[in-house]
């Protein structure tokens, strides 16, 4: 009986070889899992960096919106021009502040309503920035004709025709008026340059979510295509 039992137990020895093969397959699977995990780590880092960039763009929208409204208030010192009558600096700044605030609220609370409102305000901020830049261009080209003729006031019937003879007081008054108008023109040109920079930055800030979306989609599509190629090749 003992010999028969030993003969029956002998064929079971190759099972150890089967176990060794199974362990080898598990080690290959573990390597594959480690590779996938290492590939996922940069995505988490990229998502963290993109979220920080989004928060920075929202803060920039709020700060630049307030700055746009403040700079636009200074333009009411001058005569009524296109930037003053349109109120471009004020409504552009207001829309930018609302867009940044809505983005922060959606980040904290979520919800379909806040998502829709954030999208609409982002599109409105982009549109108002473009419209403000168009108005800025028109005002910069035609908004200074008043300063060139404001000091040409005389006692003659034609206001644009200087008097034949000017007294020393009239000459001094004309010189002071011209100097004052030159300083005023330089001041408002500086304010216009600052507004131009603010509106360009607002335009870029409103485009940041679109850039981040494209930046996320294109690498993901490339990795998906690479994964499909590896699956087809049998790796």
From Swiss-Prot:
GO terms for cellular component: membrane. It holds the Pfam family CD20. Keywords: Membrane, Phosphoprotein, Transmembrane, Transmembrane helix. The chain crosses the membrane at residues 55-75, 86-106, 113-133, 193-213. The keyword Membrane applies. It is a multi-pass membrane protein. The modification Phosphoserine is found at residue 38. GO terms for biological process: negative regulation of dendritic cell differentiation. It is found in: Membrane. It comes from the Eukaryota. Interacts with MCOLN2. Belongs to the TMEM176 family. PANTHER family: LR8/HCA112, TRANSMEMBRANE PROTEIN 176A. This is Transmembrane protein 176A. It comes from Homo sapiens (Human). The lineage of its organism: Eukaryota, Metazoa, Chordata, Craniata, Vertebrata.
């Amino acid at each position: 009986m003992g010999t028969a039992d030993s003969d029956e137990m002998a064929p079971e020895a190759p099972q150890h070889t089967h176990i060794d093969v199974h362990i080898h397959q598990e080690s290959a699977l573990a390597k594959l899992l480690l590779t996938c995990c290492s590939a996922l780590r940069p995505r988490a880092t990229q998502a963290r960096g993109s979220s920080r960039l989004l928060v920075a763009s929202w803060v920039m929208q709020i700060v630049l919106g307030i700055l746009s409204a403040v700079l636009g208030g200074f333009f009411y010192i001058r005569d009524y021009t296109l930037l003053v009558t349109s109120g471009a600096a004020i409504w552009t700044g207001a829309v930018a502040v609302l867009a940044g605030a809505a983005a922060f609220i959606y980040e904290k609370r979520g919800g379909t309503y806040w998502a829709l409102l954030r999208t609409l305000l982002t599109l409105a901020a982009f549109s108002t920035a473009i419209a403000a830049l168009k108005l800025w261009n028109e005002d910069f080209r035609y908004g200074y004709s008043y300063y060139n003729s404001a000091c040409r006031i005389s006692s003659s019937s034609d206001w644009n025709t200087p008097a034949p003879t000017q007294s020393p007081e009239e000459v001094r008054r004309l010189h002071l008026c011209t100097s004052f108008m030159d300083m005023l023109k330089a001041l408002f040109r500086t304010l216009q340059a600052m507004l131009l920079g603010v509106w360009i930055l607002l335009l870029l800030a409103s485009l940041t979510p679109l850039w981040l979306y494209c930046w996320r989609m294109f690498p993901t599509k490339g990795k998906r295509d690479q994964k499909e190629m590896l699956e087809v090749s049998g790796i």
